[in-house]
C-alpha cells in the first residue's frame, strides 16, 4: 500500500527493529492461506515471513483505522498476556477502545448486557486465541484486522498482518508500529522526526521477572553497603572541630583568694627568721605575783611591763 512513494517505504531502522524483535520468525506449521506471506523455510523447519509484505499490510491496516472518524469506535482486543499491555498503550495513544483480558461473549451481539458495544472496526492480536470476538464480529458485519502467524486461521479476518504473534517483543513492536503509522497518517506526529515513545513501553513484562529484578537490585545494593574494602579509621579534622564553652552564661561568685606560702621551704625560712629575733630579757627580774596589791585598779591604763612580753609592735611587723 505504499504506492511506490518514498515517504511510505520501509526504512532501514524499521527493518532492524523487526529483525531484533524476531518479527520475521514464524512457526513450524503453515496455513495454506498464509503461504503467500512466507519468504522461505529454514533448515530447522521454521518459516521466514516476508517483511516487505508485513509492512504493506501494516500500512493498509493503518489506513483502515484512520478512515474511522471517531477513534473510540475502533476496538482492540487481546486475550493473551503478551499483548494486553500493548493493546492498552495503543488505545491510550490513538483513542481506541480496548478489551484487555477475557472477552465476555455477547459483547457485540447481546444488547441486554451492560457491556454491549457496537464498534466499527475490530483489531485482535491472535485469531486463534481471540476466535470469540472474531465470530461475533462476523455476525454484525464488523471489519476485522488481526496479527497472524504462519499457522493462524484467516477465517473472519479481513486484513491479516503477517508477523510473529507469539513473542512478547514482536507483538509489542507490531502494536507500536501500527500506532506510529496511525498517528503519522492523522498528522499528529511528523515523519521527519522520530517518535519519542519507545517500543519498550509496549513490551509485556512477566511479574515474576520484575520481582526477581527488584530482589536482585536490592541484594546488590545491600552487598555494596556491606563490602567497603580495607577499613580505615576516618581522619578527624581537628582544625574545624568546634568545642563549645560550657562556662558561658554561668555566673561565678567572686570569692577572695587567700595567699598561702609556696611550699615547705617558705614555711621553714619564716620560722628561722622568727627564732633569730631577740626576745624580751628576764635577767635580774624577779617579780612576785603574789605581792601585788589586792586593790588594783583594772580600769587604769596598762603598765609598760605588760607590753614587754611580746616585744614591740615594730619587731613583729
From Swiss-Prot:
It comes from Ictalurus punctatus (Channel catfish). Belongs to the universal ribosomal protein uS2 family. This protein appears to have acquired a second function as a laminin receptor specifically in the vertebrate lineage. The keyword Transmembrane helix does not apply. [DE]-W-[ST] repeats lie at residues 230-232, 245-247, 288-290, 297-299, 315-317. This is Small ribosomal subunit protein uS2. One of its GO terms (biological process) is translation. GO terms for molecular function: laminin binding; laminin receptor activity; structural constituent of ribosome. Keywords: Acetylation, Cell membrane, Cytoplasm, Membrane, Nucleus, Receptor, Repeat, Ribonucleoprotein, Ribosomal protein. GO terms for cellular component: cytosolic small ribosomal subunit; nucleus; plasma membrane. The record marks 115-116, 133-134 as: Cleavage. The modification N-acetylserine is found at residue 2. Its main location: membrane. Acylated. Acylation may be a prerequisite for conversion of the monomeric 37 kDa laminin receptor precursor (37LRP) to the mature dimeric 67 kDa laminin receptor (67LR), and may provide a mechanism for membrane association. The keyword Cell membrane applies.
Amino acid at each position: 500500500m505504499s504506492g511506490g512513494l518514498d515517504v511510505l517505504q520501509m526504512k532501514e531502522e524499521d527493518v532492524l527493529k523487526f529483525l531484533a524483535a524476531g518479527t520475521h520468525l514464524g512457526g513450524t506449521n503453515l496455513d495454506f492461506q498464509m503461504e503467500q506471506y512466507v519468504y522461505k523455510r529454514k533448515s530447522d523447519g521454521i518459516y521466514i515471513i516476508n517483511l516487505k509484505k508485513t509492512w504493506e499490510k501494516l500500512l493498509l491496516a493503518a489506513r483502515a483505522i484512520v478512515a474511522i472518524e471517531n477513534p473510540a469506535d475502533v476496538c482492540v482486543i487481546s486475550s493473551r498476556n503478551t499483548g494486553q499491555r500493548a493493546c492498552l498503550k495503543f488505545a491510550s495513544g490513538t483513542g481506541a477502545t480496548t478489551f484487555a483480558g477475557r472477552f465476555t461473549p455477547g459483547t457485540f451481539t447481546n444488547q441486554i448486557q451492560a457491556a454491549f458495544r457496537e464498534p466499527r472496526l475490530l483489531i485482535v492480536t491472535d485469531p486463534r486465541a481471540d476466535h470469540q470476538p472474531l465470530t461475533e464480529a462476523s455476525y454484525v458485519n464488523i471489519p476485522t484486522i488481526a496479527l497472524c502467524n504462519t499457522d493462524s486461521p484467516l477465517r473472519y479476518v479481513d486484513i491479516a498482518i503477517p508477523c510473529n504473534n507469539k513473542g512478547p517483543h514482536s507483538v509489542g513492536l507490531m502494536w507500536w508500529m501500527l500506532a506510529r503509522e496511525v498517528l503519522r497518517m492523522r498528522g499528529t506526529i511528523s515523519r521527519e522526526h522520530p517518535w519519542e515513545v519507545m517500543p519498550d513501553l509496549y513490551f509485556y513484562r512477566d511479574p515474576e521477572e520484575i520481582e526477581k529484578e527488584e530482589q536482585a537490585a536490592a541484594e546488590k545494593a545491600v552487598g555494596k553497603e556491606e563490602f567497603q574494602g580495607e577499613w580505615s579509621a576516618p581522619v578527624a579534622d581537628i582544625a574545624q572541630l568546634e568545642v563549645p564553652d560550657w562556662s558561658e552564661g554561668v555566673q561565678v561568685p567572686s570569692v577572695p583568694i587567700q595567699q598561702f606560702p609556696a611550699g615547705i621551704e617558705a614555711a621553714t625560712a619564716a620560722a628561722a627568721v622568727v627564732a633569730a629575733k631577740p626576745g624580751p630579757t628576764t635577767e635580774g627580774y624577779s617579780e612576785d605575783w603574789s605581792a601585788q596589791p589586792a586593790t588594783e585598779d583594772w580600769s587604769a591604763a596598762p603598765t609598760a611591763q605588760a607590753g614587754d612580753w611580746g616585744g614591740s609592735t615594730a619587731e613583729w611587723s
